[in-house]
């Protein structure tokens, strides 16, 4: 399986997560979920011990934005992909936000409707 897919093109550089930045970068395109092997768990990092903990801080999913490319979306740690949702199904993100750091787009949301 290909580890990384084409990342979405960045339109401009801006700071901080916002709904406006998400709308600016996606131009109203409806994303499609790429289920693959499911949501990937991201664990908290203990700066003092310099190691990862057993605490899940977030999960990541991949979504395809037709005409734009593939984007990783950060979800809350307790997020689960809804049962019955098929690969490449159109999804609606709950409270999506985006930010641009060094021309790289980061997207987060609270869930999927």
Can you describe what each PLM-predicted range is?
Residues 1-113:
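OB-fold and OB-like single-stranded nucleic-acid-recognition modules
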């Amino acid at each position: 399986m290909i580890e990384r897919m084409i990342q979405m093109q960045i339109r401009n550089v801006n700071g901080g997560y916002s709904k406006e930045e998400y709308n600016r970068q996606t131009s109203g395109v409806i994303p499609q979920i790429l289920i693959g092997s499911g949501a990937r768990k991201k664990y908290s990092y203990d700066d003092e011990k310099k190691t990862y903990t057993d605490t899940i801080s977030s999960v990541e999913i991949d979504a395809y934005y037709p005409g734009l490319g593939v984007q990783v979306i950060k979800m809350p740690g307790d997020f689960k992909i809804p049962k019955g949702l098929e690969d490449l199904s159109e999804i609606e993100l709950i409270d999506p936000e985006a930010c641009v750091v060094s021309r790289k787009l980061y997207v987060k949301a609270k869930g999927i409707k």
